[in-house]
Regions:
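Buried hydrophobic positions in well-ordered alpha/beta secondary-structure cores of metabolic enzymes
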Residues: 9, 47, 85, 98, ...
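N-terminal small/polar loop signature for handling phosphorylated ligands or for N-terminal nucleophile
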Residues: 33, 41-109, 198-259
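Short glycine-centered, acidic/aromatic-flanked micro-motifs in structured strand/loop junctions
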Residues: 48-51, 116, 185-187, 260, ...
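Active-site nucleophile and cofactor-binding loops and adjacent substrate-binding regions
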Residues: 74-83, 265-268, 290-292, 313-314
């Protein structure tokens, strides 16, 4: 029997490998046990899915199992972004949401996310409890459970209208529509396809969307992750001239990638910092910022400038979300391009993130390169890069021993001033850092670096790879 483990955001596995109808049914049954134990079963469960291969059928399996267990299901009648489905937890006052999605993973993967009644990522405590519930289930066939489904408890619903109403209350959509922007959208064949063009229609602003159709193979891209190497087509289209900005969404639209007016990718660290500056400077909001450890030190500097607290947490919204809610932060986010905002859900929302960036442009009348210069003028230059390296599981202990070597005092000849282990290992240098951690969603070792000079960033990453012999 498969040992189901939840990472930084849900359980993910290879389709037809470990991600089977039997294991999805086990997840659903374990979730029912959890909801009953928490007194949430009577509130019902939102169930939705993304555009991946068999996602709709997997979601139907979840709905069937939950109805067989006597739990009402609000089943999405179409593929939908994770933040849209998460918001519907609040709209329906449900006990949570089960979402079939592998987010940004390659096409051969799928996943199972659980969003509790507060509409954010499940905490470590919740996922530990869920894992135990699943592990204790007796072995039984999917058919034996589904045969007992109660179709009267499955209510089909369109999750989009409540979400769009919420977005319209947060963002000045008329301002964006009347700004006359020329916006390029890359939906990466994911569940966010069509949302931004629909939201922004009916004004002077024009929208060109690519990869907006459903294609679970994600052709032409390595994976539906909005980072530079996967955005070559939108970048080349924008480079022809006339564009104002590019907005890319990942596979389930909870993350965003921004391209400037020249089609150049804006790092997610800069995007996070620019959006935070917008909220603090233009919208005059005050409150804490919550960041993952691999986010920019520019945020700490903004906190000093505007007199707000900055909290650092391990990577993953299962860690960031609770602190975001606890301190009523104005914004929370992480290096992956996932950002949450006060007044919405304590969860990443790529669509809202993109709209806030467009609102920033419409408010100031400035293009992305100028907005980035605003940030640099305020807190100085910051350069960043990340490398993802596949590794053999058998090599993990060797890598860990090298990372934790107490005698390590330089990387690429650059003195290490200090280190922390909030998540993986982060080495602090003068006005910068290098972080090394294992991904919580994929078999990858991630290296991150930030400094005030691009050459220093490159040297840190090259030096780390040489030291780790990877």
């Amino acid at each position: 029997m498969t040992d189901i483990k939840f990472g930084t955001d849900g359980w993910r596995a290879l389709i037809a490998g470990d991600f089977t109808f039997e294991n999805v049914a086990r997840c659903a049954e374990g979730l029912c046990e959890h909801l009953n134990a928490m007194g949430m079963a009577d509130k019902g469960l939102v169930v939705g899915y993304d555009t991946r291969f068999l996602s709709q059928e997997f979601a139907q399996t979840v709905a069937n199992v939950c109805s067989a267990k006597g739990i009402k299901v609000y089943l999405s009648d179409r593929h939908a972004p994770t933040p849209v489905l998460s918001y519907n937890v609040l709209h329906h006052q449900a006990g949570g949401a089960a979402i079939i999605t592998a987010s940004h993973n390659p096409a051969q993967w799928n996943g199972f996310k659980f969003k509790p009644e507060y509409a954010g990522s499940a905490t470590q405590e919740i996922t530990d409890r869920l894992e135990r519930s699943i592990a204790q289930l007796p072995t039984r066939s999917v058919g034996s459970i589904i045969d007992r489904r109660n179709s009267s408890l499955i209510v089909n619903m369109d999750p989009t209208p409540p979400y769009l109403d919420r977005i319209a209350s947060l963002v000045d959509l008329d301002l964006i529509k009347d700004a006359g922007l020329n916006v390029y959208i890359d939906s990466m064949y994911g569940s966010g396809g069509g949302y931004l063009p629909t939201i922004l229609s009916g004004g002077k602003t024009t929208v060109t969307e690519i990869h907006g159709s459903l294609n679970p193979a994600f052709p032409g891209i390595e994976q539906p992750e909005p980072i530079a190497r996967n955005l070559t087509r939108i970048s080349s289209l924008m480079a022809k001239g006339g564009a104002s900005v590019g907005v890319a969404l990942d596979g389930d639209a909870d993350r965003v990638g921004i391209l400037d007016e020249n089609g150049q990718f804006v790092t997610t660290l800069d995007t996070f910092s620019m959006l935070a500056q917008y909220l603090l400077e233009q919208k005059k909001m005050r409150g804490a910022l919550v960041k993952g450890v691999t986010s920019s030190i520019a945020l700490n500097k903004l906190g000093e400038v505007y007199g707000v607290d900055v909290h650092e947490l391990p990577v993953g919204f299962k860690n960031i979300g609770p602190k975001f809610s606890e301190v009523d932060a104005i914004m929370g986010g992480e290096e992956s391009g996932g950002f949450a905002f006060r007044g919405h859900i304590p969860e990443r929302d790529g669509i809202l993130s993109g709209l806030y960036f467009l609102e920033y442009m419409a408010t100031t009348g400035e293009k992305p390169t100028r907005l980035l210069q605003r940030l640099t003028d305020k807190v100085g230059p910051h350069y960043y890069n990340r490398r993802d390296i596949a590794f053999q599981i058998s090599d993990r202990d060797r890598i860990l021993n090298l990372i934790n070597n107490p005698e390590l005092d330089t990387i690429a000849g650059i003195p290490i001033l200090d280190n922390d282990t909030i998540d993986g290992k982060r080495f602090h240098i003068k006005e910068g850092w290098l972080a090394v951690r294992f991904s919580g969603t994929e078999p990858l070792l991630r290296l991150y670096a930030e400094a005030v000079d691009q050459d220093i960033v490159t040297n840190l990453l090259d030096g780390a790879m040489q030291y780790l012999e990877i």
